Amino acid sequence: LPFLGVETLEQEVAVARAVYAHPAAAEEMAQWNARLLMTSPMPQYNIVGTGEPRDELSEFEGMRVRATGGLGEAFKSVGAVPTSVTATEAYQAMEGGVVDTVAFAQHAHLSFGTINQADWWTANLNPGTVNCPVVVNIDAYDALSDAHREALEAAIPEAIDHYLSNYAELLERWDSVLAEKGVEKVEIAPDVIAEFQSKAGAPIHEAWIAEMEAQGIPGQELYDLVLSTLAEAKGSGS
């Protein structure tokens, strides 16, 4: 779901853990004989663009953006034109003027070279990200000895910490990457972010809740869980 207000990887991890622990998530995965083990956290996407920075909602009207899935729908709802070129085609799409902007997490802007085509990057739009769970086969998990199962579960916090520390290293040097490449860091004003959340977030959230409830999945309960967990994480300084 776009524009939930997640700002940090620590908040992302907290929300994922809460959702994964909910019985509805376990039941959903059990259809494929799978058990949710842990998240592999990915930073919030932000956009790089060419030309003048876009830091007002009205400036997204007609903007051609490489954004897929829910993020594409969110940008479309504020007048942008999403395109779903593959990640490997994003650089050429920017270079050739097929798109004005590309939405990726920082590491992907580096990996796919889109940062090299950019004039600016939004530091805090934070429209959303891709949730990437690690799952295991239920039968295989149940077949583990107590000692092996305990070792697997004990390794999860260490694995999450590794993800967080690895990304922290990249984020620490991100400002120097921007400076090196001459990319302007654009801070979106809080009132503009609130506009995005209202126009590009809330309607999609409401539609998702209704769709889940129609399928017998407690969409409202899960949504409320996400918001309460996020508020708690922010309150603790994550």
PLM region spans:
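N-terminal secretory/targeting leader peptides
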Residues: 1-13, 24-238
